[in-house]
Amino acid sequence: NNQLNASHK
């Protein structure tokens, strides 16, 4: 989940 968010940023 966190990895997906980091990609969005």
Curated annotation (Swiss-Prot):
Protein name in the entry: Unknown protein 5
Organism: Ginkgo biloba (Ginkgo)
Lineage: Eukaryota, Viridiplantae, Streptophyta, Embryophyta, Tracheophyta
